[in-house]
Regions:
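Hydrophobic transmembrane alpha-helices and their helix-loop junctions in integral membrane proteins
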Residues: 1-209
Length: 209
């Protein structure tokens, strides 16, 4: 189970196997970043749900608390690292680590609250819905953010956040779309990211309280 988990955790990516993702996004062209964030990162969580859990349910159940803790670390660590970035593309990459942490948390709550262990069926349903919805939302939001970063990079030929002062005056429509995309990435109420993250917490709180 541990070897399978490490393999899928690298793909998610889960802390401390996350270090490859920001470097890969920075070097990749926009189209590859969109595919990586929109589709490929989800395969890690999908593999944990579709391969690890059915094959080794007892082991996954016993380690569900550790998986939830790693997901929570992803949420906090990804957000803190994103705040420290000056490269706009690397900021979006670290936000992906944060977003996938919510999916990990929701998935762990599904396993811990599974009915086959006499757990909370409502929490399991909320966690599963939250994890799947979060993966979908991350795919759309992060792909949109990487496209927006690619657009401004083609114009400015750099990604230094400090060099984008006054951009709203030159590109008002672009700035408005950016604001909507980043608000969605933040998970503010009214955007899809809030719903999925809230469902992950609803699934996790009754199980890991």
């Amino acid at each position: 189970w541990i070897l399978l988990f490490i393999g899928f955790a690298i793909k998610v990516p889960v802390f401390p196997f996350h270090t490859w993702l920001p470097l890969a996004h920075v070097e990749a062209p926009t189209a590859i970043s969109v595919i990586l964030a929109g589709i490929l990162l989800k395969l890690g969580v999908y593999g944990l749900l579709r391969i690890n859990y059915p094959m080794l349910p007892d082991a996954v159940f016993w380690f569900s608390g550790a998986m939830a803790l790693l997901g929570l670390i992803n949420v906090i660590w990804g957000a803190m690292c994103a705040l420290a970035q000056t490269d706009l593309k690397k900021l979006v990459a670290y936000s992906s680590i944060n977003h996938m942490g919510y999916a990990m948390l929701g998935m762990a709550s599904v396993i811990a609250a599974s009915a086959m262990y006499g757990g909370n069926q409502a929490a399991a349903q909320a966690g599963l819905s939250g994890a799947v919805f979060q993966m979908f939302n991350h795919g759309t939001i992060s792909a949109m953010l990487f496209i927006l970063v690619g657009v401004v990079y083609d114009r400015a030929h750099h990604r230094d956040i400090d060099g984008f002062g006054g951009l709203a005056k030159q590109m008002p429509l672009y700035s408005g779309i950016c604001m909507i995309a980043f608000f969605a990435g933040l998970g503010l109420p009214g955007f899809s990211g809030f719903v999925s993250e809230f469902m992950c917490f609803i699934g996790a709180f009754p199980v890991f309280k």
